[in-house]
Swiss-Prot record:
This is 7-cyano-7-deazaguanine synthase. The gene is queC. It comes from the Bacteria. It catalyses: 7-carboxy-7-deazaguanine + NH4(+) + ATP = 7-cyano-7-deazaguanine + ADP + phosphate + H2O + H(+). ATP binds at residues 8-18. The lineage of its organism: Bacteria, Pseudomonadati, Pseudomonadota, Gammaproteobacteria, Enterobacterales. It comes from Buchnera aphidicola subsp. Schizaphis graminum (strain Sg).
Length: 232
């Protein structure tokens, strides 16, 4: 039985991954992390979406301790989401140090114990906010660590890693899911469902990508088909 575990936030990218893999895998598992993020509505969105697509199992992991360990505007309302990170000005304040390291580690533990060999993370390094833990180089190193440390063949998959936001919208269009994603996902750092606040970096990237795709859907579908493996 083909099984896959999706690290699922309830945002545009992870939802696009979920929709894509429902057409490939028989059993889909989702894992969502509550790290005391201010935009908690994404957890409600994740729960609704996974129920809608009738995934095999969806677990929610309490990681509220991360707020006490890691400084970020996503967990501290006193820090502006528009500023640079107070400890590293080359990063946005929305960067949560160690977040994806923890997400991938804990997801690997779950996958190992449920005999799941594929873990999906909907990260992207074309149109992204500059997070170092959303880069392909990071994912490859983390995958090596997990395989060596657990003596397993778990593979990390990042199907959106080389796609622009416009191409990600084209992928949702390919699966006739654009309107669903527009209406039901939470990508906004303010936790506003749908189009979001329109001001945070996440909203800007999402809306800019949507407008580009909408201006020329056939062009971005062609670009998507040149780059994307629809069978994996």
């Amino acid at each position: 039985m083909k099984k896959i575990l999706i690290i699922f936030s309830g945002g545009q990218d992870s939802t696009t991954c979920l929709i894509h893999y429902t057409n490939i895998y028989k059993e889909i598992y989702c894992i969502t992390f509550d790290y005391n993020q201010l935009h908690k509505s994404e957890i409600d969105s994740a729960r609704f979406i996974s129920n809608y697509f009738n995934v095999k199992k969806h677990i929610f992991v309490d990681l509220k301790c991360l707020k006490n360990l890691s400084i970020s505007s996503l967990t501290d309302e006193k820090i502006s989401i528009l500023d640079n990170h107070p400890l590293n000005f080359s990063l946005p304040s929305t960067f949560v140090p160690g977040r994806n390291i923890l997400f991938l580690t804990l997801s690997s533990i779950y996958a190992f114990n449920h005999q799941i060999n594929s873990i999906v993370l909907g990260v992207n390094e074309i149109d992204f906010s500059g997070y170092p833990d959303c880069r392909n180089a990071f994912l490859k190193k983390m995958n090596d660590v997990v395989q060596i440390g657990m003596n397993c063949k778990i593979n990390f998959q990042s199907p959106l890693i080389n796609l622009s936001k416009a191409e990600i919208w084209a992928l949702s269009d390919y699966w006739n899911s654009t309107q669903f994603i527009l209406n039901n996902t939470v990508t906004c750092y303010q936790g506003i469902q749908g189009k979001g606040c329109g001001q945070c970096q996440s909203c800007i990237l999402r809306n800019d990508g949507f407008n580009k795709w909408k201006s020329n859907p056939s062009y971005y579908m062609k670009k998507l088909k040149e780059k994307f493996n629809f069978d994996n």
